[in-house]
């Protein structure tokens, strides 16, 4: 699996994730504004954090 792993508005970067079957994109708001985090897997999140998990290479853009 190949997933994007940059945060918020940083330039796109990718990571190869051996053994993973998902990529994720998490989004939440704090005093800095909207924060976006991308990576491998499909983590559980706290209330108030949006999560999108997908199963194809680079699908978490």
Curated annotation (Swiss-Prot):
Q: Which domain of life is it from?
A: Eukaryota
Disulfide pairs? 3-23, 17-40, 42-53, 54-59
Q: Which InterPro entries match?
A: Snake_3FTx (IPR003571), Snake_toxin-like_sf (IPR045860), Snake_toxin_con_site (IPR018354), Toxin_cobra-type (IPR054131)
The record lists the membrane-crossing segments as: none
List the subcellular locations.
Answer: Secreted
Q: Where is the signal peptide?
A: none
Indicate yes or no for the key word Acetylation. Answer: no
MF GO annotations: acetylcholine receptor inhibitor activity; ion channel regulator activity; toxin activity
Family per record = Belongs to the three-finger toxin family. Short-chain subfamily. Type I alpha-neurotoxin sub-subfamily.
Q: What does this protein do?
A: Binds to muscle nicotinic acetylcholine receptor (nAChR) and inhibit acetylcholine from binding to the receptor, thereby impairing neuromuscular transmission.
Q: What is this protein called?
A: Short neurotoxin 2
| Source species | Naja haje haje (Egyptian cobra)
